[in-house]
């Protein structure tokens, strides 16, 4: 009985594979042209009251070799919703915001590892954003961070953002950073 059942199951499996059809519609595709876009804006990171745009959400209880008087000691985690503007003046035209997190990841050299979505809320890029996931050595006046993605007009973007510290208050951590971004996208 068991032998016959095995033969019947094998027979049905063979028929299923022989008669089963896989349907797929094949369409010719023409690759889209790669587009290069250059963006320029200012990022305002404010840690101080009365209206902070970045807040400390976790801080280590103790770290070795770290300066505890730093506004972002090693191991600190921050959430941010920072405004993006056309100019360095905080009152200049707002074009979007940067939302995400960064962690103080440099034990001896002040460094942030950031993952931030830069969303644009006005102009021709309204509703689009770029994603940055990179190391940011904040004591260097000029540095680069990697653009690893995007959405909207910047779908599948990749590129680099060159950062230039326009202003920084080393006591409280407030900063204004100029971004020059080169994007490659479709």
Swiss-Prot record:
Q: Which cysteines are joined by disulfide bonds?
A: none
Extract one GO cellular component term from the record.
apoplast
The highest taxon in the source lineage is: Eukaryota
Q: Which residues form the signal peptide?
A: 1-20
- Matching Gene3D superfamilies: Allene oxide cyclase-like
**What family is this?**
Belongs to the plant dirigent protein family.
UniProt entry keywords in alphabetical sequence: Apoplast, Glycoprotein, Secreted, Signal
- Name this polypeptide is given: Dirigent protein 4
Which GO BP terms sit in this record?
A: phenylpropanoid biosynthetic process
PANTHER family recorded for this chain? NUCLEOPORIN-RELATED (PTHR21495)
Subunit arrangement? Answer: Homodimer.
One of the Pfam families matching this protein, by short name: Dirigent
């Amino acid at each position: 009985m068991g032998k016959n059942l095995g033969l019947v199951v094998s027979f049905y499996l063979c028929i299923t594979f022989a008669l089963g059809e896989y349907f797929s519609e094949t369409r010719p595709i023409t690759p889209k042209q790669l587009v290069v876009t250059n963006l320029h804006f200012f990022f305002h990171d404010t840690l101080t009251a009365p209206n902070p745009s970045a807040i400390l959400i976790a801080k280590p209880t103790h770290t070795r070799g770290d300066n505890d008087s730093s506004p972002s000691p090693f191991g600190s985690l921050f959430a941010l919703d920072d405004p993006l503007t056309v100019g360095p003046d905080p009152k200049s035209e707002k074009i979007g915001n940067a939302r995400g997190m960064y962690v103080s990841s440099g034990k001896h050299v002040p460094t942030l590892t950031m993952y931030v979505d830069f969303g644009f809320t006005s102009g021709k890029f309204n509703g689009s954003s770029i994603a940055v996931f990179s190391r940011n050595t904040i004591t260097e006046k000029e540095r680069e961070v990697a653009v690893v993605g995007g959405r909207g007009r910047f779908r599948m973007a990749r590129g680099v953002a060159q950062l230039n510290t326009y202003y920084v208050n080393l006591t409280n951590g407030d900063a204004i950073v100029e971004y020059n971004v080169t994007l490659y996208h479709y």
